[in-house]
């Protein structure tokens, strides 16, 4: 009898609003960024999150990594409410790879090893883990001594992705992870992501506008528009041509159909 997938992540009517001007700290009228978002993520899912600019996609990932807190609603990781999980513990299970990579002045070697040190791995285990993922991502050894300023934008993005993969989290959150990579590297990364659950029991949620990549990647698609979850479909239910047209229209008006 086939084992039923477990619900790993659950959002219940999650909303998020910005309240403060970051520069003046003066109170501003509250404006909603995400509104009443509810969905479930099953273990091993590969979830694509797409929608027009300003839909709140990146903010959703920030909430899932607890870089921001919901204004309303609740998020659960394996039946534990997020606010009951220590932040350090949560981020060992849920890893966020941001769109803008920053190595914070560290060498590539230190940037990749640091999250593994936090996991209390031995030096040998760290070296083995780094070697494995560098080989998978085709990162050459001579990058290890380089700092952020000695890497191109695409190289920094690849190293940033490696930082997310080396800890082999339960859930990996990716924000436009291939936006500065060439076609061959992008295809290799999509292939790696598709095998993550089989090899490392990792669930993946990825924000991306490139529908050809999403078609190759996802088992489920979430479509956001104006901060609302407009559609939650299995990949087999998605009309990709209609979705492409919807994204084009959404940049200029509010029509929704796919």
Cite the ranges covered by each PLM segment.
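Helix-to-loop junction immediately C-terminal to a conserved catalytic motif
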Residues: 65
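Conserved ABC transporter NBD signature motif
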Residues: 73-81, 90
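Conserved ABC ATPase "signature" region
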Residues: 125-142
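Catalytic Walker B motif of ABC-type/P-loop ATPase nucleotide-binding domains
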Residues: 172-176
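H-loop/switch region of ABC-family ATPase nucleotide-binding domains
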Residues: 208-209
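Conserved beta-strand-loop-alpha-helix hinge in the C-terminal portion
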Residues: 228-251
């Amino acid at each position: 009898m086939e084992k039923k997938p477990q619900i790993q992540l659950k959002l219940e009517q999650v909303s998020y609003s910005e309240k403060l001007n970051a520069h003046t700290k003066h109170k501003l009228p509250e404006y909603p960024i995400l509104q009443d978002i509810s969905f479930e993520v099953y273990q091993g899912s590969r979830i694509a999150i797409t929608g027009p600019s300003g839909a709140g996609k990146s903010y959703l990932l920030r909430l899932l990594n607890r870089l921001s807190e919901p204004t309303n609603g609740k998020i659960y990781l394996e039946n534990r409410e997020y606010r009951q999980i220590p932040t350090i513990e949560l981020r060992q299970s849920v890893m966020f790879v941001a769109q803008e990579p920053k190595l914070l002045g560290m060498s590539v070697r230190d940037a990749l090893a640091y999250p593994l040190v936090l996991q209390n791995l031995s030096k040998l285990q760290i070296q083995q883990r780094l070697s494995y993922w560098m080989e998978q991502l085709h990162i050459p050894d001579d990058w290890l001594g380089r700092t952020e300023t000695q890497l191109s934008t695409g190289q920094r993005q690849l190293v940033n992705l490696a930082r997310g993969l080396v800890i082999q989290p339960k859930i990996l959150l990716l924000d436009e992870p291939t936006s500065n990579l060439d076609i061959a590297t992008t295809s290799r990364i999509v292939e790696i992501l598709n095998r993550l659950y089989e090899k490392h029991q990792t669930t993946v949620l990825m924000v991306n506008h490139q529908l050809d990549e999403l078609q190759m990647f996802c088992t489920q698609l979430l479509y956001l528009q104006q901060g609302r979850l407009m559609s939650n479909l299995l990949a087999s239910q998605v009309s990709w041509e209609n979705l492409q047209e919807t994204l084009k229209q959404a940049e200029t008006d509010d029509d929704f159909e796919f």
